[in-house]
């Protein structure tokens, strides 16, 4: 498979897996189906969803492209933005801007700063979030994220790797917490 500009695209294991479901592609982190799905939807649709999920460094000039399906974002994404996007999946498709505190009071209990009203924006349907969560639960049960599986707690997540494994990413959530981890070397 090639990108529309002719650049070849490979899966991280350098093999072609033939026809697979989107679910299988998520579980086993297979690149080509992700790019094919984004191509069918159009990179602009994917770009617009990422904007709604709070990705602040996106460039309409450079990032409305097929590699967006694999995290190919020109100016990158922060762990905080990635965590907030995964929190939206965990919350039925509702995005909330991340906050570092909810309320600050003085010694008498007077509210000095109130950040408790963090309104949600419905980015995608709850049914979509549920299907995605279910597939990402299987990433931890039998896919590329088995090492992140937790005993006695539901968890869902997704792994990601750049060329030559210079960057390794895991983002996921439990019913209580959402986190993204990025490991890199030069």
Identify the role of each PLM range.
Residues 1-3, 13-57, 63-91, 137-138:
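Active-site-adjacent helix/loop patches that line small-molecule binding or acyl-intermediate pockets
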Residues 58-62, 183-186:
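The feature captures the short pre-catalytic strand/loop hairpin that immediately precedes
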Residues 1-19, 96-110:
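Short, glycine/proline-biased beta-turn/loop segments that scaffold the active-site neighborhood
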Residues 6-7, 61-65, 114-117:
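Short acidic, glycine/proline-rich loop/turn micro-motifs
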Residues 24, 28, 75-186:
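A penicillin-recognizing enzyme superfamily signal
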Residues 9, 47-48, 72, 107-108, ...:
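Charge-rich, low-complexity amphipathic helices
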């Amino acid at each position: 498979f090639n990108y529309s500009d002719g650049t070849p695209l490979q899966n991280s294991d350098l093999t072609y897996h033939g026809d697979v479901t989107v679910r299988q592609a998520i579980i086993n982190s297979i690149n080509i189906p992700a790019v094919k799905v984004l191509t069918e939807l159009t990179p602009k649709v994917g770009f617009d969803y990422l904007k709604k999920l709070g990705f602040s460094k996106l460039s309409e000039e450079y990032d409305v492209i097929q590699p967006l399906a694999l995290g190919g974002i020109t100016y990158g994404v922060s762990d905080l933005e990635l965590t907030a996007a995964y929190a939206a999946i965990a919350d039925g498709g509702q995005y909330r801007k991340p906050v570092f505190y909810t309320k600050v009071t003085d010694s008498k209990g007077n509210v000095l700063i109130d950040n408790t009203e963090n309104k949600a924006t419905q980015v995608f349907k709850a049914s979509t979030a549920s299907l995605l969560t279910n597939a990402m639960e299987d990433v931890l049960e039998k896919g590329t994220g088995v090492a992140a599986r937790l005993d006695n707690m539901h968890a869902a997540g997704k792994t990601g790797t750049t060329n030559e494994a210079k960057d390794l990413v895991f983002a996921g959530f439990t019913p209580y917490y959402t986190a993204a981890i990025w490991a890199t070397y030069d």
